Swiss-Prot record:
Catalytic activity of the protein: dUMP + (6R)-5,10-methylene-5,6,7,8-tetrahydrofolate = 7,8-dihydrofolate + dTMP
Lineage: Bacteria, Bacillati, Actinomycetota, Actinomycetes, Micrococcales
Gene: thyA
An example Gene Ontology CC term for this record: cytosol
PANTHER family: THYMIDYLATE SYNTHASE 1
Name recorded for this polypeptide: Thymidylate synthase
């Protein structure tokens, strides 16, 4: 029985069908528009195996988002530097993901904690079609070091299972997408546990789905590799709140992967 390879198939799609486009960074891309991947979180945890994905960085970044933080110092203290290229001299990034998730400003000077409201509403009214969190705050985009690439996500409850769909407006398919898939799969598992639900699907939807011109050789190397089965994720503790998880609460089991493939980041 062959191993499903939705992510690798997406890479092949971009390489075969992508249109060459210029971009903000000046690097150049091959790009397609409007793609979707699905992952069954009840079966496994979608950590890509054709190269190593650094799970610690995935988890630390997600916990940082949930803190509502805008400064890279907390991540640096955990040994994670993935946002350093965009931070200013003081480590500030402006009102990026976590700020919007936890402290979306209102016209009267208040703030909305979208994650707290999400958890409350999922518990009280699981069949609602409004279980949505947005990081795309048009009025604050100019103040962000980097406008949100993964901009908008929605949860869905059916038959005791929690599913999540992410809309990613800009998808760096080689470097970013494996990370984003793992991050939102992890978030879905965490939210499901807090609500006493089983994990359902994670659905990834991409807008401008691209491979940078300086990643083409790396993609070719990755696609030459045979995939392994996805690992399992164990969550070792159920804290009192979605905001109380720590890195030690997560254990990835049976993660068999090919070596890391390094590539430059387009800043």
């Amino acid at each position: 029985m062959s191993i499903p390879t939705p992510y690798e198939d997406l890479l092949r799609d971009v390489m075969a069908n992508g249109t060459h486009k210029s971009d903000r960074t000046g690097t150049g891309t091959r790009s397609v528009f409007g793609r979707q991947l699905r992952f069954d979180l009840a079966e496994s945890f979608p950590l890509i195996t054709t190269k190593r994905v650094h799970f610690k960085s995935v988890a630390v970044e997600l916990l940082w988002f949930l803190r509502g933080d805008s400064n890279v110092k907390w991540m640096q203290d955990q040994g994670v530097s993935i946002w350093d290229e965009w931070a200013d001299a003081d480590g500030e990034l402006g009102p990026v993901y976590g700020v919007q998730w936890r402290s979306w400003p209102t016209p009267d000077g208040g703030h909305i904690d979208q994650i707290s409201e999400l958890m409350t509403n999922l518990a009280a009214n699981p069949d609602s079609r409004r279980h949505i969190v947005s990081a795309w705050n048009v009025s604050e985009l100019k103040d962000m070091a980097l406008p949100p690439c993964h901009a908008f996500f929605q949860f869905y409850v059916a038959d005791g299972k929690l599913s999540c769909q992410l809309y990613q407006r800009s998808a760096d398919t080689f470097l970013g997408v494996p990370f984003n898939i793992a991050s939102y799969a992890l978030l879905t598992r965490m939210v499901a546990q807090q609500l006493g639900l089983e994990p359902g699907e994670f659905v990834w939807t991409g807008g401008d789905v691209h491979v940078y011109d300086n990643h083409v050789d790396q993609v070719a190397e990755q696609l030459s590799r045979e995939p392994y089965e996805y690992p399992q994720l164990k969550i070792l503790r159920k804290p009192d709140s979605i905001f109380d998880y720590t890195l030690d609460d997560f254990e990835v089991v049976d993660y068999r992967h090919h070596p890391t493939i390094k590539a430059p980041i387009a800043v």
